[in-house]
Structure formats: C-alpha cells, structure tokens
Design a protein with these regions (language model features):
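Conserved short histidine dyad/triad with adjacent acidic residue
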Residues: 33-37, 48-65, 106
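Conserved hydrophobic/aromatic beta-strand scaffold that supports enzyme active sites
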Residues: 31-33, 49-53, 70, 93, ...
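A short, N-terminal "cap"/entry segment at the start of jelly-roll beta-barrel domains
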Residues: 1-46, 94
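Double-stranded beta-helix
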Residues: 2-11, 85-88, 109-136
Length: 136
C-alpha cells in the first residue's frame, strides 16, 4: 500500500505537449503525480493518478496519447474540446465544473482551458493500453 498526501508531491510546470510531431505551448498548467506504477517499456508508468492545476486563462492545447484518460473536475470551470482526428477541427465542446468527469479514449485528440477567474483543478487517471512494441 502506498499513502501519499498531495502536498508532498512535486508541482511540475508543464510548458509543452507534443502533437503530430510538433511541440505546442501549454499555458499556466502544472501537475502533481499522486501515484504512478509499472513500466510501459518506454519510460512511462502503466497506471497513474495526477492532480492538475490550471491558472485563469491557462490551457492545454490539442494533443493525444495511447492511454485512456478519465478526468474529474475538483474546482473551477473548464471548456473541454474534442477534435476530429482527420482535420483537427473542434467537433465537441463542453463546459465542465466540479463533480464532472470526462472520459477520453485512446488516441482521441483533445484539449481544454480554464474559463474561471481562479486556479482550477482536476484529477486525471491514466492507464496505458498499447503493446510495448507499438508506437505511432
């Protein structure tokens, strides 16, 4: 059993996210890894629980990944986007506040921004779903 208090976890600023071979700016965002276990064969955990904080006006740009992801909004308000994988155009928007969960399937392009006037937080649970030999 592992027991961790969130304040004991390093708060790491995120500056960039990769998407389609290019790096995209992440604005006003930090993450604390509350739990990460296993090895996916590429230096990433097989399972993880993260606490994200996004400052007012901050955003996470379009990106995707192999792992499934579920986010649970703790505080503030976010506009969440789903993008068409062929065109990268927004195909769905949702305003999400405390108590809302958002599921993102493997490889679905997505992003979000903080639309509130306060730092906003969410938990993010990830689980890798790909074979160790398979990478895009």
């Amino acid at each position: 059993m592992e027991v961790v208090h969130w304040k004991e976890c390093e708060d790491k600023k995120i500056d960039k996210f990769p998407y389609r071979g290019q790096m995209h700016d992440v604005i006003g965002t930090s993450v604390r890894w509350l739990s990460k276990h296993g090895d996916d064969g590429h230096g990433y955990p097989e399972y993880g629980l993260r606490l994200f904080t996004i400052q007012p006006g901050g955003r996470i740009p379009i990106h995707n990944h192999f792992y499934h992801q579920t986010m649970y909004i703790l505080s503030g308000e976010f506009e969440c986007w789903e993008f068409d994988p062929a065109t990268d155009e927004v195909i769905k928007k949702a305003i999400c506040g405390p108590g809302t969960s958002i599921y993102i399937p493997s490889l679905q392009p997505h992003g979000m921004k903080n639309t509130s006037d306060q730092p906003s937080t969410f938990l993010c649970c990830i689980c890798n779903v790909y074979d160790k030999e398979t990478m895009l």
